[in-house]
Amino acid sequence: MIQLQALSKKFNKKVIFEDVTLVFEPNKSYALVGQSGSGKSTLLNAIGRLEKPTSGAITLDNRNIWDIKEKTFFKRYLGYVFQNYALLDHQTVLDNLKIVNRDRAQIKAVLEQVGLDQSYLKAKIFELSGGQAQRVTIARMALKEKKVILADEPTGALDDKTGSEIIDILLGMVSANTYVIIATHDPKVYSRVDEVIDITQL
């Protein structure tokens, strides 16, 4: 499980969140909700070791995440879906996916899982729609079989239909060995997860 123990984050004198204690279990999906500026993205980044908390601890399977080697944590454990995709725009879909897994059969299988056929392999990222690029991001993460899947406003730049399909894919990744945590303010997203956590109430 993932445990947040008395977690606090401050920027200068501004308190982003304070004394947060939470438990996340595998085989469940979670949404961190709250209005813009409430700190949900900062909390998500702390769980993903992208921002260090001011105080408190985060453990993954009883191990402090900051005690795990940085390369090991990001390579083996963390999968992150950003609103801006975090892909190499001028490289092809295949090039982006081969960075993490060079097995063509696995690449094709994962692309199908996210709703893209083989014709997209030679397309460059900048040629894709927002929804298609987001699918490639998720495909790349699936190829690495990540344990902790974090998504920060993954539908923010997408139309309702595409956004719903992206959430379908993310929720389909929930398993006995996987954590799926989504930061969102969209009720169409958080109404579909197993547990909603309002960060303003912590």
Regions found by a protein language model. Name each.
Residues 124-128, 132-134:
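Conserved ABC ATPase signature
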Residues 65-79, 175:
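ABC ATPase NBD coupling module
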Residues 48:
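Helix-to-loop junction immediately C-terminal to a conserved catalytic motif
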Residues 149-152:
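Catalytic Walker B motif of ABC-type/P-loop ATPase nucleotide-binding domains
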Residues 2, 17-19:
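Conserved structural motif at the start of ABC-family nucleotide-binding domains
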Residues 104-120:
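Conserved ABC ATPase "signature" region
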